[in-house]
């Protein structure tokens, strides 16, 4: 696939999957669109409806996504970090409307400096607010779902608005009510009034903790969800998964639930899948538990 086959929009380009995933995986190409405004999104939907670009698919920062080794007939939509979808608006009473393209860690830092917090435990999670919401990201016993009051987005398959309000449910461990084809555009989150100095200190401590425990190399974070009342990392370590390698990827010696690319170069998605399947096989054969991936594949 080349961009010459598609309607040319000023905010689109053709990239290799390895350029849009934090794991740097996937040698195939895909169309990537970075709309800044609602008008840009409308232009994308119009082009899709006319068959001038491939089907649209949401893309956050690519921090928990596995790419493809072949070209895919998709147009990945990554909201621009310098457009209207990264704005933060104070609504009063601790409520803020936050654009889905805003980076989660930076947003929490800015809110802390303004005297709002309560989510410091999530501040070390990489990626965008939209991506964190789509998977209900969590850390330190917290989940982002706890702060959500409403969501707004766009169903890329139908072109229709999509919305969620508190009380409608749909949240769970690494699970949200957001359908796979919905591109989140904003969310209303509720924060507590806090001491800026104390909240900034908590965020600083979380960043320091992350730096200590995060394995070296390009990665997409934890490979598998924790099974009920158990730890995926512990099961993987018990079954000898540390050090397994395929291509440029290996299971980290520091944390058995991480696959890392210590070369930081481009790798094949198939090598990641080889490791993922072997990790699953070992745990299932030894412990009778089929680990469920935390990573996603587009659409």
Where are the language model's segments positioned?
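Anion-binding (especially nucleotide phosphate/pyrophosphate-binding) glycine-rich loop
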Residues: 2-129
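Structural signature of FAD isoalloxazine-binding scaffolds in flavoprotein oxidoreductases
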Residues: 26-27, 31-38, 66-85, 134-167, ...
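Short, basic and Ser/Thr-rich N-terminal targeting/leader segments
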Residues: 52, 59-61, 147, 217-218, ...
